[in-house]
Amino acid sequence: MTTQVPPSALLPLNPEQLARLQAATTDLTPTQLAWVSGYFWGVLNQQPAALAATPAPAAEMPGITIISASQTGNARRVAEALRDDLLTAKLNVKLVNAGDYKFKQIASEKLLIVVTSTQGEGEPPEEAVALHKFLFSKKAPKLENIAFAVFSLGDSSYEFFCQSGKDFDSKLAELGGERLLDRVDADVEYQTAASEWRARVVDALKSRAPVAAPSQSVATGAVNEIHTSPYSKDAPLVASLSVNQKITGRNSEKDVRHIEIDLGDSDLRYQPGDALGVWYQNDPALVTELVELLWLKGDEPVTVEGKTLPLNEALQWHFELTVNTANIVENYATLTRSETLLPLVGEKAKLQHYAATTPIVDMVRFSPAQLDAEALINLLRPLTPRLYSIASSQAEVENEVHVTVGVVRYDVEGRTRAGGASSFLADRVEEEGEVRVFIEHNDNFRLPANPETPVIMIGPGTGIAPFRAFMQQRAADEAPGKNWLFFGNPHFTEDFLYQVEWQRYVKEGVLTRIDLAWSRDQKEKVYVQDKLREQGAELWRWINDGAHIYVCGDANRMAKDVEQALLEVIAEFGGMDTEAADEFLSELRVERRYQRDVY
């Protein structure tokens, strides 16, 4: 929109300030501009002169601190909703991302709420690793003056369900904190549990926290609203797929696709480091197979979110069919009295193993039963979008977004099975076909603000994706900082993703160094962590020169092996013992010089 600027003589801003203000508000809608106006009014009224007129100084108010520790955005959304609820109740509240929280100040907190997800094998989200480490260290203070509550989000298909929340809850209590409420562990379908928990938190805090003055509520409540867009997880953009290109060789064991999606004139914005959320539909053939195995027709009416739909449509659009869980196996066994599955009930490890190796449709195939349509629906979990690290920068591709998709395919007793979202993009969306997408912002995986800062990128396999975006951005910015890429995959000839682009960046001098690890091209397997150790001396020089280190890819094995290699390099070339090296790497993480996007 165009904003009419008053004559310069009437402005209290100098030309430079005016230019910065105009640049910051160019893309805002009228609603957003109105919000900004209210925000600055709140800031103005937060000045000492204004505060003098309030009933009590803010310093005397035991404010509420909400710490949001999010990996995919769900925890952040719950935390923001709670913040809004508390502001509506006129309570003094501050919301802070775990990565921005100065954790040494935790001893001075009075009322603390933690909303956290879990990643990998029970680890906290990336932005909360430093806080988690601090609380579990010898440096953790006594917290006898804190009252706290924890809301934990997880996925029951994983063994360490909600482990991060369990960790925070038990440690805060161990350090002397008082539980406001018992911890809540929420599964993938977390919305109802979150809504009920938020109401209980507000009720519990009303009796403990004084009411805030309106001006204070405006200022403290709005600080963390950074990203605004008409499109979201719940209201995705209907975009179109323009390119679906296989970028692994004919003889590769992997099927990796370069996907380009046209955003049209939506003005949907993203930054390198963000993720693309993709809502997919299940394979109609898979739906038909499952329905027929249960002796159903597919046209039976079922209720989904208050709407009546045919069973086939509900299964294709609304329910998760490609990821089994221990809960589903246990419930199916109990419901059908399956002689094969009933012995697994109550055996957590066996249930987890069965769910991990047996898709839902094959569970039904191996243990057939007859269910009615509603019983089937009640057994399943809601379909959730998949997130892919964005592999492009809008500085180069403008109204497009690119992702790098490893297509999941495997056999179960002679039948080919595939991942829900990856096979949707690779096999079922035709050129110019519709794809529902949204941006999941990730401020914990960002290029350095200073373009002169060196960058070290470690991304084997499809973990290369965000570094393609990084390089496009650095090239467009003509950033003078050095760039070093570590990439690995099984074979040079079949699996060198975006090979021509990396070679061009090297030739142009944009990519300063590239180290490649091909795990199957020689007798002894070589991985990126081996290359890190091999280049330890030079790596330490880059770190000493202020380099930022980025890691993307598998959380369970690769990321841990890479971190161990980094610790060894720091210890050897930095002349540190193991404990000092660990402290050094933790400090890099706090300084945002060590960032990971792992999954």
Swiss-Prot record:
Domain (FAD-binding FR-type) ranges: 234-448
GO CC entries: cytosol
Cofactor detail note: Binds 1 FAD per subunit. Binds 1 FMN per subunit.
Catalytic activity line of the entry: hydrogen sulfide + 3 NADP(+) + 3 H2O = sulfite + 3 NADPH + 4 H(+)
EC category: oxidoreductase
A GO MF label: flavin adenine dinucleotide binding
Stored InterPro entries: CysJ, CysJ-like_FAD-binding, CysJ_Proteobact, FAD-bd_FR_type, Flavdoxin-like, Flavodoxin/NO_synth, Flavoprot_Pyr_Nucl_cyt_Rdtase, Flavoprotein-like_sf
Gene Ontology process terms (BP): cysteine biosynthetic process; hydrogen sulfide biosynthetic process; sulfate assimilation
Ligand binding (FAD): 322, 356, 386-389, 404-406, 410, 419-422, 599
Binding-site residues, NADP(+): S519, R520, K525, V526, Y527, V528, Q529, D561
Residue intervals of the Flavodoxin-like domain: 64-202
Gene3D superfamilies: 3.40.50.360, NADPH-cytochrome p450 Reductase, Chain A, domain 3, Nucleotide-binding domain of ferredoxin-NADP reductase (FNR) module, Translation factors
Keyword field: Amino-acid biosynthesis, Cysteine biosynthesis, Electron transport, FAD, Flavoprotein, FMN, NADP, Oxidoreductase, Transport
Pathway note: Sulfur metabolism; hydrogen sulfide biosynthesis; hydrogen sulfide from sulfite (NADPH route): step 1/1
Superkingdom, taxonomy of origin: Bacteria
UniProt-listed Enzyme Commission number(s): 1.8.1.2
One protein family per Pfam: FAD_binding_1
Subunit structure: Alpha(8)-beta(8). The alpha component is a flavoprotein, the beta component is a hemoprotein.
Function: Component of the sulfite reductase complex that catalyzes the 6-electron reduction of sulfite to sulfide. This is one of several activities required for the biosynthesis of L-cysteine from sulfate. The flavoprotein component catalyzes the electron flow from NADPH -> FAD -> FMN to the hemoprotein component.
Family under the similarity heading: Belongs to the NADPH-dependent sulphite reductase flavoprotein subunit CysJ family. In the N-terminal section; belongs to the flavodoxin family.
Name used for this protein in its record: Sulfite reductase [NADPH] flavoprotein alpha-component
Organism: Shigella dysenteriae serotype 1 (strain Sd197)
